[in-house]
């Protein structure tokens, strides 16, 4: 387990799935965690289970004032900011590109791209102001590395996240700030579990498209994210860590 004792980390989308698993592992690794979500009940439940090492802040990452407030509240609560896991996103699938409405496309870009940009912007500014050599991890996707049919707006958004990650790594390496992307394949999140409950063929299909023969559990993504956030990855920046069971290898 990585040692993050005394470090302060923001986790967006921290109320469920990969975000929740990452909060739990960060707390177990000694970190203080600012849990951000738009689901107050879920976020507060994660904090209640943290043993006093986490605080919940409501944040819609597509809203600049919310993101600025999240960073300010984190600094006020914990006295610094050492890292961030920008994980909040909305997955969308099921339509060929020409059938995607402009409204749906913009929603994907607003949350998945603009939200990630805003989070990085204000996290980086806070780190530079305090001279902190921090680490930022953005959740991309296998869909941010390859084309996936029927996922047009999501593929476009996650490719943009990968690009923003690489640019930020190049821009801010001189400040000692590392920026990397986590690239999951399919993950057993609550949303995916609901979809599988309604479609008996979905789980066997997802297993079949990952060379490892199954898809990921949230804690496996959390382990990868926490490693990137830790000093164990001190020379890793601008990278896309594929924790995807081989999905992007074929």
UniProtKB/Swiss-Prot annotation:
UniProt family annotation: Belongs to the short-chain dehydrogenases/reductases (SDR) family.
A biological-process GO annotation: response to toxic substance
Taxonomic source organism: Sphingobium indicum (strain DSM 16413 / CCM 7287 / MTCC 6362 / UT26 / NBRC 101211 / UT26S)
Residues annotated as binding NAD(+): 9-34
Function according to Swiss-Prot or TrEMBL: Catalyzes the dehydrogenation of 2,5-dichloro-2,5-cyclohexadiene-1,4-diol (2,5-DDOL) to 2,5-dichlorohydroquinone (2,5-DCHQ), a step in the degradation of gamma-hexachlorocyclohexane (gamma-HCH or lindane). Has an essential role in this assimilation pathway that allows S.japonicum UT26 to grow on gamma-HCH as the sole source of carbon and energy.
Name of the protein in question: 2,5-dichloro-2,5-cyclohexadiene-1,4-diol dehydrogenase
UniProt enzyme class: oxidoreductase
Disruption phenotype: Cells lacking this gene lose the ability to grow on gamma-HCH; growth is restored when a plasmid containing the linC gene is introduced.
E.C. numbers: 1.1.1.-
Keywords on record: Detoxification, NAD, Oxidoreductase
CDD domains registered for this protein in UniProt: SDR_c (cd05233)
Induction cue: Constitutively expressed.
GO molecular function, one term: 2,5-dichloro-2,5-cyclohexadiene-1,4-diol dehydrogenase activity
Top-level lineage group: Bacteria
Signal peptide stretch: none
Pfam families: adh_short_C2 (PF13561)
Residues annotated to bind substrate: 141
InterPro entries membership: NAD(P)-bd_dom_sf, Sc_DH/Rdtase_CS, SDR_fam
Active-site annotation: 154
